Amino acid sequence: MMAAETAAAGVASRLAAARILAAVFDQGRSLKAELTAALPGVSDPRDRALVEAICFAVLRRRPAYDVALRQWLERPLPPRDAELKALLMAGFAQLDVLQLPAHAALSATVEACRALGRPRQAGMVNAVLRRAQREGFPAVADDAGWPSWLRKQLRADWGDQAEAIFVESARMAPMWLRVPRARVSPAEYVARLAEQGITAHTDPVLADAVRLDTAVPVSQLPGFAQGDVSVQDGSAQQVADALALAPAARVLDACAAPGGKAAHLLERHPQLQLTALDVDARRLERVRQTVQRTAPDRTVRLHPADAADTAAWWDGQPFDAVLLDAPCSATGVVRRQPDVLLHRRADDIDALCALQARLLEACWRTLRPGGQLLYTTCSLLKRENQTQIEAFLQRTADAQAQPLGAQFGHAAGAGRQRFPGEQQCDGFFYALLLKAS
């Protein structure tokens, strides 16, 4: 790429990041959705990676950048300057988290200001970024980015452990991979990665897992398109360990999208009779694509349906096992979805708990006597996890809690809770229930 083209691409990357961030901050949009929509328009994989890295860095460091802007700007930027404010934060992230060469970060960000149609503000952007370069950024509390109601709830639920949650949730999560051991072992895949110059490790607990030292685009993963590897956090991979399944068991994945857990179960148990549901038909299409990539010779029954509305999808034949990966607050995956802290509201938890209870009741009806239901969330809130399960056990005479080992996390009522960063995995809750014969 010629120098002029490289410079133009650098400006376009900063501009794309600013527009994504403005949509997240000021329009309440999902970071994941905005990245999915914007990144295909960025041609170079390195520029796509830069856009993504800037966005994540800004969201993780937003409290410090907000303080810096209040201190360094003569007057606050008006709401109409949302993209300009986001661009300044994108510049901060390049100097702070990403540690890019200052001349490149400043030049491209100032030019992006002009590309925004704000040439008169280019001098201000340059001056603020140079001050950031000289002075660094204000120190803020580890919990500064968390809504006050959520800070209080986590401290009430977990005491001193909450402080570690705040710290770990601000860190970058490692990239975990899952391999189908029937085709390739984790050790063999680590060797394949090494041939590509990618350093990775197997895991002593997770039998199908590989963890990268540094994240890479999936396009760089050998055999990804052929189903030799998938991206899946270690906590999510343990779902397959928790369910003891007969070879041809009838299994329901009640909230299946995007399909990683369904695909993992099929890799482990090729003869499973798997039914996968999701209330969103577009997300269910992702399940189909995931299974088609990883297990093209397997048959899965897909239903775009609300699992709680059994009359709409269930044929009355009971399942041997049910996986209910319930909709939740996502408070255990803030390091992967930092915009959760912007968008989550206290009254969301009431609605989520009610939905989880309805799903538990409905899925339980579809389970045969002697069958198992695995309830999981990526939440850290007791109301969604151990309190939810304890209430279900109290009102459900034929439900019995089954023990899970310490490899699933800390004892939490009838289940197990992992906190973010433990075993380098995401925050996650597991509860295994047996339906009495």
Swiss-Prot record:
UniProt name for this protein: Ribosomal RNA small subunit methyltransferase B
Enzymatic reactions: cytidine(967) in 16S rRNA + S-adenosyl-L-methionine = 5-methylcytidine(967) in 16S rRNA + S-adenosyl-L-homocysteine + H(+)
BP-aspect Gene Ontology terms: regulation of DNA-templated transcription; rRNA base methylation
Top class in the EC scheme: transferase
Pfam families: Methyltr_RsmB-F, NusB, RsmF-B_ferredox
Binding, S-adenosyl-L-methionine: C255, A256, A257, P258, G259, G260, K261, D278, D306, D325
EC number, as in UniProt: 2.1.1.176
Stated family: Belongs to the class I-like SAM-binding methyltransferase superfamily. RsmB/NOP family.
Organism the protein comes from: Xanthomonas campestris pv. campestris (strain ATCC 33913 / DSM 3586 / NCPPB 528 / LMG 568 / P 25)
Chain's gene name: rsmB
Tagged with keyword Methyltransferase: yes
